[in-house]
Amino acid sequence: MKIFFTMLCASILATSVFASNCEIKIEGSDMMKYDVAEITLDTSCEQTKISLKHAGKLPINAMGHNVVIVEEKNLSKITQQINFSLGVEKGYLPESEDIIFISAMVGGGDTTELEMDMSKLDKTKSYVFFCSFPGHWALMRGKIKII
């Protein structure tokens, strides 16, 4: 019993020391909502992967979703540039240094993954994520907590 208890304690300690949250899962729906309002990004991870699943059924041209990450101070400036004429391939956004990360746009039933180099984020700054499909950002956005 003593050996079992020792091994149990060791495994718990090892899990808390070595565990890191380097993979985030988000779902978007046909109701123009993410299933989370905040995500936590761990800077101890060199890379973090965000997996976005579109849990709805509507096609990409009617209800596409993606994940865009910007500094909170730039949210208004970036969202004002969203335009259908820029196309789904670009997430309806022009190229901009203010866009730190952007995933591919997906339609109902599809999933996209965004690999992020965590060195591009600064713990002293505030970040947000949002969907850049025209009109979605007003409801589909959230805060990013960096630890």
Predicted features by range, described:
Residues 53, 58-60, 101-147:
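Extracellular/periplasmic metallocenter environments
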Residues 1-5:
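Positively charged n-region of N-terminal signal peptides that target proteins for export
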Residues 33, 87-101:
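Short beta-strand and strand-turn-strand segments in soluble, beta-rich domains
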Residues 20-29, 70-92, 134-147:
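Extracytoplasmic/periplasmic copper-protein system
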Residues 15-19:
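Sec/Tat signal peptide C-region and signal peptidase I cleavage site
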Residues 21-47, 58:
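N-terminal edge beta-strand
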